[in-house]
Amino acid sequence: MPEIFLWTRAAIWAAALFALFVFVPNRHPRAARWDDPTLTHDLGAVTDVWARWDSVWFLRIAEHGYDAATGAASAFYPLYPAAVAVLGRAFFGHYVLAGIVISLAASFCAFVLLYELAEERLGADGARRAVLYL
């Protein structure tokens, strides 16, 4: 089961990097408003490809807390940003990397839980397929 997790995550990462290098130079000019270059770090495209869209809000909350002036950040639950804030400080300010590590750990836990639940009803083969389809 861990091999399914590793292969699927590697495939998603490869697809994201491919999209970054192929499509970003040709993207719509207003698409940049969803990116925040102040949140990216020296780890480059390997991690920054994931700092898009709602992750910008989560990273801002992790670094600076909830801003009462905008109020828009209140739409995001606090557990994930709090975990990113703690791990980000342990990673010396690499909040994007902390978010990736937390997201990977959470998805691995979801894989394990789904496997355990599916194994009871579907057997080992069915559980592996369920995890693969996740």
Regions found by a protein language model. Name each.
Residues 1, 96-100:
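Residue-level signature of transmembrane alpha-helical entry/exit and packing/kink sites
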Residues 1-38:
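Start-transfer (signal-anchor) and selected internal transmembrane alpha helices
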Residues 10, 101, 132-133:
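Hydrophobic residues within the alpha-helical transmembrane core of Major Facilitator Superfamily
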Residues 13-18, 22, 86, 113, ...:
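Hydrophobic membrane-targeting alpha-helices
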Residues 45-52, 56, 100, 106-107:
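Hydrophobic transmembrane alpha-helices and immediately adjacent juxtamembrane helices
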Residues 49-93:
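Short hydrophobic/aromatic helix or loop-helix immediately within or flanking a transmembrane segment
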Residues 80, 84-88, 99-113:
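Transmembrane alpha-helices of multi-pass, membrane-embedded glycan-processing enzymes
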Residues 97, 115-134:
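Transmembrane-helix signature of polytopic, membrane-embedded enzymes
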